[in-house]
Swiss-Prot record:
PANTHER family: EXODEOXYRIBONUCLEASE 7 LARGE SUBUNIT. This is Exodeoxyribonuclease 7 large subunit. InterPro entries: Exonuc_VII_L, Exonuc_VII_lsu_C, OB-fold_nuc-bd_dom. Its EC number is 3.1.11.6. GO terms for cellular component: cytoplasm; exodeoxyribonuclease VII complex. It catalyses: Exonucleolytic cleavage in either 5'- to 3'- or 3'- to 5'-direction to yield nucleoside 5'-phosphates. Residues 496-526 are annotated as: Disordered. Heterooligomer composed of large and small subunits. GO terms for molecular function: exodeoxyribonuclease VII activity; nucleic acid binding. One of its GO terms (biological process) is DNA catabolic process. Bidirectionally degrades single-stranded DNA into large acid-insoluble oligonucleotides, which are then degraded further into small acid-soluble oligonucleotides. Keywords: Cytoplasm, Exonuclease, Hydrolase, Nuclease.
Length: 526
C-alpha cells in the first residue's frame, strides 16, 4: 500500500510558500493591470476618512471591487464622489498579501458621461424641490440701494474684478469679499460656510452685515461647476436671510443654487448690475423731480401771493376801520359835556324857581343840600367819563390788536374758505347734476303729457279746427256770420270754406235787452 504522504513521490510542480505565492500573485496582478479603466457605480461611499483618504467600492450588476483614493489624489478631483454615481475610474490594481485581497487604487475619476451627472442633478432637484426649497414664496426682494454687498467667490480671477469694476461704475458701495474655492474638493463646504458666515453677522456690528449677497463663479464644464450643485450649498442659499443673487457660469449654465437663490443672474457682471442702480440715472431723476417740485412750490407761492393781494385790496385800511369808532367816541365825549352843562343849567333854573318860594334859612339849607348833591353828581359824572374813556381806550387797543392779527386770521379764514369753496363746488356740481337729471326726467314726462294733450292728436281721430279770417280758433257757432271766409284745419292740412248762413246761439242763451237811452244825459265812455 502506497503512502499518501510519501515525500519521495515524483512531481514537476514547484513548491511555494504562502508568502512567495502571494508575492508572485501581487507582482503578476500589478504587472498585468498596472493601468486600467473601470466603469462602475460607487457603493458604500461615506466621504473622506479622517486621514483624508476615501474608501468605497465600484460595482455593477454581477461583481464588486474595492477602491481607494489617496488624500493627494482626492484633493485634485474636479468633483466630489457621491453614493450611486456612475463613474469611470483610472488607476492600478493592487493586492494585499496578508489578506489575499485586491483593490483598485484610483488616480483619476470622472463621471460616466454628462448623462449620469444630469440624472443625479435631476434626482437631487426633485428631492430638494419637494422640501419647498425652490418655492417662489421663499424668494426675497432685492434692496433698491444696498449699503453693503457681500461677494462669495474666488479672490483671484476675472470674476471678482468684473464685479468690483461694475459696482464702481454704477454706484460705488462697500463690498465685502469672502474668499472661497469654487472648484474641487471642499469647494461646496467653503461656499456654504461663507453664505452662513455672512448671515451670522449682526447688524451694527464691527463688520457691517451685507444687504445683499452675490455667489459668483466663471464659466466651465459641468464637472467644474459641480460644487454649486452640492446639497449643502443649495440648503445654505435657501436658508439665507439676506437676499442672494446666484451668478454661476454663463447664461446657459444652470446649477441647483440658481433655483434656491432669490434671483439668478446670467453672468457675474449681470449680478453686479442687479445689485446696485446707476447713480447717474438716480441723480438725473432726483434733479428732474427737484425741478418739478420747485416749480410746483413757485406756482403755489405765486397763487397764494395773488390771493393775499386780492384780499388785502378788498380789506379797508386801518384809518377806515377806526374812523367810525373814533367819530362815535368824539360825539359821545362832546355830547357828554353839553349834556352835563344843560343838566346843570336846568337844575340851576329849577333851583332858582324853588328858591323864590323859600325862606332864607330853608333856602340856604336847600342850596347846601343841592350843592352837595350837585357836587356828588359831578364827581360821579367825572368818574363815569373816566370809565368811558378807559373803556374806549381798551376797545381801541383791542381793535388795534385785532387789526395787527388780521392778516394771519384772514389767511386762515381764506384757506378755510377756499377749502369750503372746493367742498361746496364739488357738492354743488353733484347737486346740479342730480337736478339736471331730475329736470330732464320731468321735462321728458311733461313732453309726453304735452304730446298726449296736443290738439294734433285729437285731429288725427277725425276732428277738425275752424279758424276765422284772422286765423283765430272759432269755438262757438254764433261767432260766424253768413259769407265769412273760414279755414278748416285737419290733421294733414287745411282747406278754405265760406259760411252760407250765420250761426245760431245755443238753445239756453238769452238775448241781453238794451236799455233805453236817456236823451237828456250824456253817456259814459266806461
Amino acid at each position: 500500500m502506497s503512502n499518501l504522504f510519501d515525500s519521495d513521490s515524483p512531481t514537476n510542480l514547484a513548491e511555494y510558500s504562502v508568502s512567495e505565492l502571494s508575492g508572485s500573485i501581487k507582482r503578476t496582478v500589478e504587472t498585468a493591470f498596472d493601468q486600467v479603466r473601470v466603469r462602475g457605480e460607487i457603493s458604500g461611499y461615506r466621504g473622506p476618512h479622517s486621514s483624508g483618504h476615501a474608501y468605497f467600492a465600484l460595482k455593477d450588476d454581477r461583481a464588486r471591487i474595492d477602491a481607494v483614493i489617496w488624500k493627494g489624489t482626492f484633493s485634485r478631483l474636479k468633483f466630489r464622489p457621491e453614493e450611486g454615481m456612475e463613474v469611470i475610474a483610472t488607476g492600478k490594481v493592487t493586492t494585499f498579501p496578508g489578506s489575499s485581497k485586491y483593490q483598485i487604487v484610483i488616480e483619476t475619476l470622472e463621471p460616466a458621461g454628462a448623462g449620469a451627472l444630469m440624472a443625479l442633478i435631476e434626482e437631487r432637484k426633485r428631492k430638494l424641490g419637494a422640501e419647498g426649497l425652490f418655492d417662489a414664496a421663499r424668494k426675497k426682494r432685492l434692496p433698491f440701494m444696498p449699503k453693503v454687498i457681500g461677494v462669495v467667490t474666488s479672490p483671484t480671477g476675472a470674476v471678482i474684478r468684473d464685479i468690483l469694476h461694475r459696482i464702481s461704475d454704477r454706484f460705488p458701495v462697500h463690498v465685502l469679499v469672502w474668499p472661497v474655492k469654487v472648484q474641487g474638493e471642499g469647494a461646496g463646504d467653503e461656499v456654504a460656510n461663507a453664505i452662513r458666515g455672512f448671515n451670522a453677522l449682526e447688524p451694527g456690528g464691527a463688520i457691517a452685515r451685507p444687504d445683499v449677497l452675490i455667489v459668483a463663479r466663471g464659466g466651465g464644464s459641468l464637472e467644474d461647476l459641480w460644487s454649486f450643485n452640492d446639497e449643502i450649498v443649495v440648503r445654505a442659499a435657501a436658508e439665507s436671510r439676506i437676499p442672494l443673487i446666484s451668478a454661476v457660469g454663463h447664461e446657459t449654465d444652470w446649477t441647483l443654487i440658481d433655483y434656491a437663490a432669490d434671483v439668478r443672474a446670467p453672468t457675474p457682471t449681470g449680478a453686479a448690475e442687479m445689485a446696485v442702480p446707476v447713480k447717474a440715472e438716480l441723480e438725473a431723476q432726483a434733479t428732474a423731480l427737484a425741478a418739478r417740485l420747485q416749480g410746483c412750490i413757485n406756482r403755489q407761492m405765486d397763487q397764494r401771493r395773488q390771493s393775499v393781494r386780492a384780499l388785502m385790496r378788498a380789506l379797508p385800511s386801518l384809518d377806515q376801520l377806526l374812523a367810525l369808532p373814533r367819530r362815535r367816541f368824539d360825539e359821545a365825549a362832546a355830547g357828554l359835556g353839553r349834556g352835563l352843562e344843560l343838566n346843570t343849567i336846568n337844575k340851576r333854573r329849577g333851583f332858582e324857581r324853588v328858591a323864590s318860594h323859600l325862606r332864607p334859612d330853608v333856602l340856604s339849607n336847600r342850596i347846601a343840600e343841592r350843592r352837595q348833591l350837585l357836587n356828588d353828581r359831578m364827581a360821579r359824572a367825572e368818574r363815569t367819563v373816566e370809565r368811558l374813556l378807559d373803556r374806549s381806550k381798551s376797545r381801541i387797543d383791542r381793535a388795534e390788536a385785532i387789526l395787527a392779527s388780521l392778516p394771519t386770521r384772514l389767511k386762515t379764514q381764506t384757506d378755510r374758505g377756499r377749502e369750503r369753496l372746493g367742498n361746496l363746488t364739488r357738492h354743488a356740481d353733484t347737486a346740479i347734476r342730480h337736478q339736471l337729471t331730475r329736470a330732464r326726467a320731468e321735462l321728458s314726462a311733461q313732453d309726453r303729457v304735452l304730446q298726449s294733450l296736443s290738439y294734433k292728436n285729437v285731429l288725427k281721430r277725425g276732428y277738425a279746427v275752424i279758424r276765422d279770417e284772422d286765423d283765430r280758433p272759432v269755438s262757438q257757432a254764433a261767432a260766424l256770420s253768413a259769407g265769412m271766409g273760414i279755414a278748416i284745419e285737419f290733421a294733414d292740412g287745411r282747406v278754405g270754406a265760406m259760411t252760407t248762413e250765420g250761426g245760431t246761439p245755443p238753445a239756453g242763451a238769452k238775448k241781453r235787452s238794451a236799455k233805453p237811452a236817456d236823451p237828456t244825459k250824456q253817456g259814459s265812455l266806461f
